[in-house]
Amino acid sequence: MSQTLQALADGLPVDAFAVLGPHPLADGRRQVRVLAPGAEAMGLIDSRGKLLARMQASAIDGVFEGILSIEGPYRLRIVWPDMVQEIEDPYAFAVTLDESLLLQIAAGDGQALRRALGAQHVQCGEVPGVRFAVWAPHAQRVAVVGDFNGWDVRRHPMRQRIGGFWELFLPRVEAGPRYKYAVTAADGRVLLKADPVARQTELPPATASVVPGTDTFAWTDAAWMAKRDPSAVPAPLSIYEVHAASWRRDGHNQPLDWPTLAEQLIPYVQQLRFTHIELLPITEHPFGGSWGYQPLGLYAPTARHGSPDGFAQFVDACHRAGIGVILDWVSAHFPDDAHGLAQFDGAALYEHADPREGMHRDWNTLIYNYGRPEVTAYLLGSALEWIDHYHLDGLRVDAVASMLYRDYGRAEGEWVPNAHGGRENLEAVAFLRQLNREIAAHFPGVLTIAEESTAWPGVTAAISDGGLGFTHKWNMGWMHDTLSYMQRDPAERAHHHSQLTFGLVYAFDERFVLPISHDEVVHGTGGLLGQMPGDDWRRFANLRAYLALMWAHPGDKLLFMGAEFGQWADWNHDQSLDWHLLEGARHRGVQLLVGDLNATLRRTPALYRGTHRAKGFDWSVADDARNSVLAFIRHDPDGGGVPLLAVSNLTAQPLHDYGVGVPRAGAWREILNTDSAHYGGSNLGNSGRLATEPMGMHGHAQRLRLTLPPLATIYLQAEK
């Protein structure tokens, strides 16, 4: 026994529960052992503080022993050099984790993992405290260390459970202390690791986990949650993409906290009539320069903006204001920081051991092992946690293409084929289907949006039909083609007209979102306005025309912050947007236009009810490359509302008496013109109202004769 006690006191792998705590003696009494390095004296007391037995310091430093003659619970009175502590003995408690939960996690159950792992407030009998639980199957020993035990790796070794799980209940621990796990690897190294399932963390660059508060937040968004019905008539979807740390900053160039963001961002989004905010990843991440796309704390909102409850208050306020919240969520890879998931228990655990499978060369990050059920449970649990605990309305899953292909970013010989010899990552496909299946089953109406840049078939098709089951997919092809077109001098555009029209060949193959995202305004490209050709007048005109064309085009909308008022420069994640630009009338004009585009989208069923259905779209002019003119009809395929005609003239010359075929006779009204003086244009247009002529054109029985302002998009709508 002395050797075992010495090993225990030295922090070596020992079954602590076999040695510490109460153990029956042959005469009916109990022997109690406690490990408390640094303590000066110790006694056993009852619940009222009455001394039951004095503990004797053994010959092994830090180990105290005593004999308890009575039955029932006891507490410890520990005399430290600077205080006296009275607390229950952690090693007097039975297991607190149901084995069935651990078996469910081992089978890939994310809901079970949410309930079991991390720092969970529980009550053992009458005693409140925190149960710490972690998965580390290759470890010889795991201890929890933190502010509550002086970060002494010897003090609180955990109990090993089936499947490589470890748990320990620490009585009377409350919210707020920092903690980590001290993981002893098979080779004897002791690794200090943050909790993979921590619900709260300390502010980077510090890396400890934090015991969270109890779940007492009082939500007030019941009305919003009740209307989240997947069977309802399609609604407008217009997303404002936001990097919370740089949308606006305080006077010291620090990120705003959640209450201040709610106070400033929500009214702004309401003013511009966006339906949703999409946040770049706020899962805790060590490196701010990753924009959140290299996270390690998949269950915790970053501490950069305050507490988890602060984030809940932000979402609640968005919902009360009628704004949905989507989170960019990263399940493709993770960084190799020493405190994180990499080699978590001394061996490849969350990642593949073979770097041909386990490392992203492009990003120098590690790839999750989707073939391991506990890993997929970890990822599924994270997704469900954000949707359930924080009432999120959607997840935009990052870098899906990198998940789907084993040879993504790799040369020949640098990747491992699947079981059938192919390049598809079959385990990742199964995981993505399971992710979408569970979200749809548990949280119907929640969006799942794939950032998928290849032609993988059926990203938004039903799983039963062989698809991946996402509700939406980013249309990267449309974005690349149309931006490339708009960046050309108008005199050259006639030779590249197909870049505008090709997207309509496949526009209804998936449920697409048209993304003008953060990726388009970094790495020296300049802001969206800065990418437009010509002098300042032409740049603004091009931008306005492009945005209106985008809002009329089939597909839901996403616009990154700053584009809505014409930021010139690259986005800089370390500083605020250039809000001073709104002192200029043309920048205010772009902002007014975006608000009007969203208002038009919201009140025009023709623009959103058929946005994913070919029956909601008809060409009028697709082939006028010489004049760089595009014209099409949008209408509600179910017969509601009235049709809308969108016409873009993307040359610098006005066109007069330009004939466009339309499907309905009578009066048509110009409802939006990006060349309006209201938006900073030259104010050339169609005087509000026009009548059709009974002359067939472009496959329609009627035509309109239009004035097309230069570098402009106009909308006309048939009068009822």
Curated annotation (Swiss-Prot):
Pathway: Glycan biosynthesis; glycogen biosynthesis. Keywords: Carbohydrate metabolism, Glycogen biosynthesis, Glycogen metabolism, Glycosyltransferase, Transferase. One of its GO terms (cellular component) is cytosol. It catalyses: Transfers a segment of a (1->4)-alpha-D-glucan chain to a primary hydroxy group in a similar glucan chain. The active site is at D398, E451. Its EC number is 2.4.1.18. GO terms for biological process: glycogen biosynthetic process. CDD domains: AmyAc_Glg_BE (cd11322), E_set_GBE_prok_N (cd02855). One of its GO terms (molecular function) is cation binding. It comes from the Bacteria. Monomer. Catalyzes the formation of the alpha-1,6-glucosidic linkages in glycogen by scission of a 1,4-alpha-linked oligosaccharide from growing alpha-1,4-glucan chains and the subsequent attachment of the oligosaccharide to the alpha-1,6 position. Belongs to the glycosyl hydrolase 13 family. GlgB subfamily. This is 1,4-alpha-glucan branching enzyme GlgB 2.
